From Swiss-Prot:
GO terms for cellular component: cytosolic large ribosomal subunit. The lineage of its organism: Bacteria, Bacillati, Cyanobacteriota, Cyanophyceae, Oscillatoriophycideae. This is Large ribosomal subunit protein uL3. Residues 133-156 are annotated as: Disordered. The gene is rplC. Gene3D superfamilies: 3.30.160.810, Translation factors. Part of the 50S ribosomal subunit. Forms a cluster with proteins L14 and L19.
Amino acid sequence: MAVGLLGTKLGMTQIFEEESGLAIPVTVVQAGPCTITQIKTAETDGYSAIQIGYLEVKEKALTKPELGHLKKVEASPLRHLKEYRVDDTATYTLGEAVKADIFNAGDLVDIAGTSMGRGFAGYQKRHNFKRGSMTHGSKNHRLPGSTGAGTTPGRVYPGKKMAGQYGAVKTTTRHLQVVRVDAERNLLLIKGAVPGKPGGLLNITPAKIVGK
């Protein structure tokens, strides 16, 4: 697995292609800068990986174990830590900054985040059920319909699509294209939408291509 970045979703806008003039919807992501806080090797940990930290905060926002872990490498208090497996750790050093310039325009990335929470939602909003007739004496407008058989099995099977909590779960959108990289401000312009609300934490990794 290649090293990725932690970032923050800032919002959406659009840019225009110079040649065709087409408008491209893009999400602006604050990608890093992240700090390498730990390097794991096969000799000491059984596998090779690097750990990065993101989002500097006040010391009181972290626990003493977290502060002690970061002080070992003389890193600032960082809110989020994330580990990425790598084939070779020799090219990385403790305290090194990982920035948005690890990606280039045209790269494909996978972005994981927490989807927007929509609270307790019904059948139509949560599962796209078709509603009943609104006229002709129908009393079945937004009801679910049948939830299963009768005496046998005498219960509703687990996993039945019903009303409930919608959103606020970890989700990944795959194979999104990096349209533009602003290395000075550590910004990525990603084509299309990414999970979550503005201000949400994102995990940005090179896209996993099947067969490669």
